[in-house]
Amino acid sequence: MKITEKLEQHRQTSGKPTYSFEYFVPKTTQGVQNLYDRMDRMYEASLPQFIDITWNAGGGRLSHLSTDLVATAQSVLGLETCMHLTCTNMPISMIDDALENAYHSGCQNILALRGDPPRDAENWTPVEGGFQYAKDLIKYIKSKYGDHFAIGVAGYPECHPELPNKDVKLDLEYLKQKIDAGGDFIITQMFYDVDNFINWCSQVRAAGMDVPIIPGIMPITTYAAFLRRAQWGQISIPQHFSSRLDPIKDDDELVRDIGTNLIVEMCQKLLDSGYVSHLHIYTMNLEKAPLMILERLNILPTESEFNAHPLAVLPWRKSLNPKRKNEEVRPIFWKRRPYSYVARTSQWAVDEFPNGRFGDSSSPAFGDLDLCGSDLIRQSANKCLELWSTPTSINDVAFLVINYLNGNLKCLPWSDIPINDEINPIKAHLIELNQHSIITINSQPQVNGIRSNDKIHGWGPKDGYVYQKQYLEFMLPKTKLPKLIDTLKNNEFLTYFAIDSQGDLLSNHPDNSKSNAVTWGIFPGREILQPTIVEKISFLAWKEEFYHILNEWKLNMNKYDKPHSAQFIQSLIDDYCLVNIVDNDYISPDDQIHSILLSL
């Protein structure tokens, strides 16, 4: 959705101020993965109206990362995204590529900028075959895409740094040209002089510009960064900022606390001015400072606002990619690997995403693992060692999983996202299984008719009821598999799939081609929703991915000359099978799966 539409929609239904976050593209692959996790956590904590991603001009890897970040934010994280686009080092061919990628990812918002001079240049000069001014870029976007994109422009409350003599009148003329060219909203440069900003807003309105004015808010984290950023932007520092920060400049913690209070006072004055109802926070890819500002302003969402958010309509985050608009069902196997699931289904057409059925002959095939990129494990090889050390026994792996279940580890090779409170009803049993060398991979507890607004298990529209069958996926020594199968042979409630790295599949599923709904919800005036399933075809695709993850982990060990760990992980691949069991008796409180596995 366009930013302008979102802000107007919110204005008509609530008088509460809104906000957004800006992130820049990290330089390393590990930094990118860390940023995705941070963006996700900040969304969960605050429900921003949108995020925006800065542009790394000049081509190469970093430019592609800008569009990759936008696509992932839209498609995987379900975040409304605005993409920066600059004229710096950008011939039209590169601009076309960036716009096309944004368009296909579902992004509907562009912040059109001239951009700063390249790092190795003293002055800004246009690139051959590109644009000199932001207004020309705006006109070009409009000519190619019409009204598909809401286009933001930059505003400078203290004038553009390159304008001679701080000519405010001329700067406003340039801003008006960008609005007249098709700009839909203004995001300003950072500032600290709130009185000057309010006066500037009055001049913007007097000049006939009626689009939303969104102030850019820079948190104060350290004294040195505070001075450096003010100097870089050539902005003034009010006396009351200096008088409160100078005496404590060597105490980072106190600077952060007092600095946050100063920014909160500034933001409150902006919101009270009548010109501003939305704050755009420059996060600098940090998490705590922006959330502290919002918390002290008392504008973070209430519990009811969290429950009413449209992305909570399913137990997994709804994608904003238009190709996935019909998606209502996902296999449970990728519950903790949403990035690879979206990648492996990215080639599906709009009408191929299941919205009620899954696993029949008409279902599309999962894409190759190559679609996930060069690495299936999201952490760098060095980070893998830091997180998971060098396991040489099944007890070492069990120790890692138990730490993950207890929240002491945020991820595992096969689990990209942290564990949550959903597992609490079966957590003790999961830990006990791992202590008995049965390595748990994925799970969910039984749920029988909990209200859909429940903090932990709830999802979907309010006033409904949600249900779950208990599900457990685990690694089991092949030597124990015959006894498990024999035990399950006469059990009418427990269904399973078991497979090894060679693809030998065993199952007691009554119809291997049909899906088994393991999560469903009943809501007033709607058909039953069944968003999470277990079925054969997707399990075979997941098995391929899982054993490739183990192999990649092994190769990391070889890379760092850890032969004993590499040999052990190879033994996991060779000697363990991947099993999942569903307890279809969602009413019984007994944990049959746990009891049976402990008896093996």
UniProtKB/Swiss-Prot annotation:
| Gene Ontology cellular component annotations, sorted alphabetically | mitochondrion
Pathway noted in the entry: One-carbon metabolism; tetrahydrofolate interconversion
User: What does the entry list as the binding residues for substrate?
Assistant: 116, 189, 282
Q: Does the keyword NADP apply?
A: yes
Q: Which cofactor does it need?
A: FAD
Where, in this chain's numbering, is NAD(+) bound?
22-27, 54-55
- EC number(s) from the headed UniProt entry: 1.5.1.53
Identify the keywords attached in UniProt to this record, alphabetized: FAD, Flavoprotein, NADP, Oxidoreductase
Q: Please name the catalytic residues of this protein.
A: 22 (proton donor/acceptor)
Give the reactions, separated by semicolons, that this protein catalyses.
(6S)-5-methyl-5,6,7,8-tetrahydrofolate + NADP(+) = (6R)-5,10-methylene-5,6,7,8-tetrahydrofolate + NADPH + H(+)
| Gene Ontology MF annotations | FAD binding; methylenetetrahydrofolate reductase (NAD(P)H) activity; methylenetetrahydrofolate reductase (NADPH) activity
Q: Name one GO biological process term.
A: methionine biosynthetic process
| Chain sites annotated for binding FAD | 54-55, 84, 114-116, 133-134, 156, 171, 178
Q: Which protein family is named in the record? A: Belongs to the methylenetetrahydrofolate reductase family.
Q: What else is known?
A: Present with 8600 molecules/cell in log phase SD medium.
Q: What is this protein called?
A: Methylenetetrahydrofolate reductase 2
What is the source species? Saccharomyces cerevisiae (strain ATCC 204508 / S288c)
Gene name of this polypeptide: MET13
